């Protein structure tokens, strides 16, 4: 994971106003892993793992792990495979602004998350010669499982 993290950010052009630190928080079912790196020069400066404990909320444990991050640190949440589903469907024939809404209904019977709690994004797939219509990969997760954590991170000025 750390090598992938470093490779990604080594390809990202440096911005004049870039934050001095970037971080990722991996959300696994039984532990959390925080990786913090300096942006210039790119260098991993901290890797910390926290085993999840009964009695404390998931959000509290995440916040305890990122508590020492300076305000405005860019944090990327990485979901483990059990926290999302990926499905492939035909791309709806609607304007781009309406694709997310249309996809919600296209995948509602293909995912375990209730429609009113569905958070999703999609990726266009390259067209194949034997395909009759354009396809998309849809990534779906539970909004309620992430909303409180994201709100708390925003209160702590973590981006």
What feature does the model see in each segment?
Residues 1-159:
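Hydrophobic/aromatic-enriched cytosolic interaction surfaces used to assemble or bind macromolecules
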């Amino acid at each position: 994971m750390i090598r992938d993290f470093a490779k990604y950010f080594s390809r990202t052009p440096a911005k004049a106003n870039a934050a001095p630190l970037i971080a990722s928080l991996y959300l696994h079912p039984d532990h959390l892993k925080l990786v913090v790196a300096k942006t210039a020069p790119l260098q991993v400066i901290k890797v910390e793992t926290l085993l999840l404990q009964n009695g404390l909320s998931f959000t509290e444990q995440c916040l305890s792990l990122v508590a020492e991050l300076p305000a405005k640190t860019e944090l990327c949440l990485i979901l483990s495979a059990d926290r999302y589903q990926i499905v492939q469907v035909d791309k709806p024939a609607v304007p781009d602004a309406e694709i997310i809404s249309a996809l919600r209904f296209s995948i509602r019977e293909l995912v375990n998350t209730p429609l009113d709690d569905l958070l999703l994004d999609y990726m266009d797939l390259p067209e194949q010669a034997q395909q009759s219509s354009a396809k998309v990969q849809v990534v779906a997760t539970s909004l309620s499982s992430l909303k409180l954590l994201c709100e708390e991170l925003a209160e702590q000025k973590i981006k």
